[in-house]
A protein has these predicted regions:
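N-terminal glycine-rich FAD/FM-binding segment characteristic of electron-transfer flavoproteins
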Residues: 1-192
């Protein structure tokens, strides 16, 4: 059993939101007396995650996955969940995570709540922002596998150094995943 997290990165650098996810997952793992396992794609120095409570990194190095589709990421994460016997998967509030989390929940027949602003209770009830953050919802997840999407800036990063193991991970992806290809990702800048 483990808490699995997907680490958002850009140009090989771990994003700030990934440290929030790691801090949140560490708090859950401490309650459940288990480990935190992170999945990284093309991150040359995943050791930085040890400072935020990550025990193990499944490190994927594959230039073909530089720009990854939600479907491909879904297949990759399914294999990571199975490999680590993960019962909880935590995502940030990134657009990529918001696209893949529902796909993964459907594939694993898992319960999914997004925009979470609290740690789960013992009965696995979580608070989440709804209606443009004007209301709070209480949701209970009672499926064997639970997928959690954090609200942006809901958790302060907190350092908790642990021993880290980095393991190469080479998931087998179906041929159909290579038919969908993300050519580029563009970010808006300046005034909108």
């Amino acid at each position: 059993m483990s808490v699995l997290i997907y680490i958002d990165s850009e140009n090989g650098k771990v994003k700030k939101s990934a440290f929030e996810v790691a801090t949140y997952a560490r708090a859950i793992a401490d309650k459940q007396q288990t480990k935190v396992v992170a999945v990284t794609i093309n991150v040359p120095q995943p050791e930085v995650l040890a400072a935020y409570g990550v025990n193990k990194v499944l490190s994927i190095t594959n230039d073909q996955l530089q720009h990854i589709s939600a479907n491909t990421l879904n297949h990759l994460l399914q294999q990571a969940v199975a490999k680590e016997s993960s019962t909880i998967v935590v995502f940030s509030a990134s657009s990529q995570a918001k696209g893949v989390a529902p796909l993964l929940a459907n594939s694993l027949q898992a319960g999914y709540v997004s925009n979470i602003i609290s740690l789960p209770t013992e009965d696995f009830i979580v608070k989440s922002n709804v209606f443009s953050n004007k209301a709070i919802s209480l949701s209970q997840i009672n499926t064997p596998i639970k997928i959690l999407g954090l609200a942006p800036n809901a958790f302060k990063t907190e350092e908790k150094n642990v021993e880290l193991t980095v393991e190469p991970f080479a998931p087998t992806l179906p041929d159909s995943d290579w038919g969908i290809q993300v050519i580029t990702t563009e970010k808006t800048s300046g005034k909108v």
